[in-house]
């Protein structure tokens, strides 16, 4: 009950103090106006304040004592996730280098996949290979290994065949390679038989076409006006050359 007695004194002091403070400050400061105090006529009418005893919150609950610490072991709820066995389809090249010097009686059954840069490396013969090249069990024969695939071997064979096919190509002479290089000029698209036939008919009627007629012929034959113009120029040059050869023969 000491708590209730202290609270009772606190409430009584809070009611009495404002009156005494007003009388104390009113003499010093004239600007402060007196507030009407709302006090009861007789303070003896106030009875002692009593508060009910605080009931325990978990007094009647069914909750048992909760331990504040847990066991250091793994709780029973935790179930570790089983990782599947790693079976990679690729063999790293840096693992193969160490495996090449060891004799193997049987092909390896388990491949390991380790992280490595994707940069291409070069074999001793100058061919490039990737570290992610798929190797078949047949590659490991007689304790050795080979990283050259069938695609790379066919590619090198085609390159060697192209060099041999060129009559004057010299792999060590860059000038010879430049002279025998293929032309980079865009190939002209040939006209279809129907287009050539219609252009020949038009050329028989008139060797020179007007601009409007060229646009009309180009629209009918699904060509551009420039293509029709160039074809007629070439056809006139061919006709002049043919006539010149006939006059020489006569």
Swiss-Prot record:
CDD domains associated with the record: homeodomain
InterPro entries named in the record: Abd-B_homeobox_TF (IPR050803), HD (IPR001356), HD_metazoa (IPR020479), Homeobox_CS (IPR017970), Homeodomain-like_sf (IPR009057), Hox9_activation_N (IPR006711), HXA9/HXB9/HXC9 (IPR017112)
Positions of the UniProt region annotated as Disordered: 105-177
Annotated GO biological process: anterior/posterior pattern specification; DNA-templated transcription; embryonic skeletal system morphogenesis; proximal/distal pattern formation; regulation of transcription by RNA polymerase II
Residue ranges with Basic and acidic residues bias: 149-169
Residue ranges for the DNA-binding region feature of this UniProt entry: 184-243
Subcellular location: Nucleus
Keywords: Developmental protein, DNA-binding, Homeobox, Nucleus, Transcription, Transcription regulation
Main location: nucleus
Molecular function GO terms recorded: DNA-binding transcription factor activity; DNA-binding transcription factor activity, RNA polymerase II-specific; RNA polymerase II cis-regulatory region sequence-specific DNA binding
SMART domains per the UniProt record, alphabetical: HOX (SM00389)
UniProt entry tagged with the keyword Transferase: no
Pfam families to which the protein is assigned, alphabetical: Homeodomain, Hox9_act
Family assignment from sequence similarity: Belongs to the Abd-B homeobox family.
Function comment: Sequence-specific transcription factor which is part of a developmental regulatory system that provides cells with specific positional identities on the anterior-posterior axis.
Protein name in UniProt: Homeobox protein Hox-A9a
């Amino acid at each position: 009950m000491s708590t209730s007695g202290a609270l009772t004194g606190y409430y009584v002091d809070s009611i009495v103090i404002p009156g005494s403070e007003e009388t104390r400050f009113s003499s010093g400061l004239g600007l402060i106006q007196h507030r009407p105090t709302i006090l009861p006529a007789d303070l003896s009418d106030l009875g002692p304040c009593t508060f009910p005893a605080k009931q325990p919150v978990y007094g009647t609950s069914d909750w048992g004592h909760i331990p504040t610490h847990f066991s250091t072991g793994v709780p029973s709820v935790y179930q570790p996730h089983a990782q599947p066995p790693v079976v990679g389809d690729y063999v790293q090249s840096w693992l193969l280098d160490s495996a090449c010097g060891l004799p193997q009686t049987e092909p390896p059954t388990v491949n390991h996949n380790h992280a490595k840069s994707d940069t291409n490396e070069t074999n001793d013969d100058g061919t490039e290979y990737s570290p992610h090249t798929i190797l078949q069990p047949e590659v490991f024969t007689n304790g050795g290994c080979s990283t050259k695939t069938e695609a790379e071997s066919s590619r090198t064979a085609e390159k060697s065949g192209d060099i041999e096919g060129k009559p004057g190509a010299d792999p060590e002479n860059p000038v010879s390679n430049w002279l025998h290089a293929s032309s980079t000029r865009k190939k002209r698209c040939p006209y279809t038989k129907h287009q050539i036939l219609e252009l020949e008919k038009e050329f028989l009627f008139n060797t020179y076409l007007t601009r409007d007629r060229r646009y009309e012929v180009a629209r009918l034959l699904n060509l551009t006006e420039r293509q029709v113009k160039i074809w007629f120029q070439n056809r006139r040059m061919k006709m002049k050359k043919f006539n010149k050869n006939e006059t020489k023969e006569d």
